[in-house]
Amino acid sequence: MLAINNIEVVYDRVILVLKGVSMDVGEGTITTLLGANGAGKTTTLKAISGVLRSERGEVTKGAVQLGDKRIDGMRAHDVTRMGLVQVFEGRRVFENLTTEENLIAGGHVQTAGAVKQGIDLVYSYFPRLKERSTQVSGYLSGGEQQMLAIGRALMSRPRVVLLDEPSLGLAPMLVEEIFGIVSRLVKQERLSVLLVEQNATMALAVADHGYVMENGRIVLEGPADKLRDNSDIKEFYLGLNEGGARKSYRDTKHYKRRKRWLS
């Protein structure tokens, strides 16, 4: 469905951020991208969705393909029309619009009939949004705003959704609820999801496949269940040592982690 083939990303024509990144996202699956802050995860999503141009970045090598069509270099709105949409970190709802007006805005490329169908679909997965349909979205809770951000993305009827840190700032129960809904969407609507997430435990619990990024490179990949059992993942992303006890990131030197990834 989505293939990223050996891409490099440069900002301001001099700053190399991504260095030969390759990934695949299968149809009807969740693929997660893990990594520390600054590893290049969000840049990867922006390279796929076409947002880099607005931030003086560009894909200088490699290719991004959606199905059989190459989309790197396309403008973001054209990528959206082709069936790929990004849900940004921080939710970014239109705070002065109501919940339903946000959804209508997300469906602006659709016909009136399709917008109505889209709203009904969103409300079927997020009934809490239906209860808040006339409420100004700036007064929604953080969890409700995240639901709205995902629902707004669904209004364009995408085939692929890029999710950037959906658990950020949310209580554990809300995180579990939202990830459960995303899993249902993938299974029932045959969506493909590329998930960037700091909560590695939750991400690997819902994902089918995972990648680990460090300093702009993919350093580890595999089925999610295998990654959950990987000793490096346990130690550095799940915070568990070999005996199963919790381990602080501060107890481990960064160079040791790099050496182990690259060995």
Q: Each predicted region: which residue ranges?
A:
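ABC ATPase nucleotide-binding domains
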Residues: 240-263
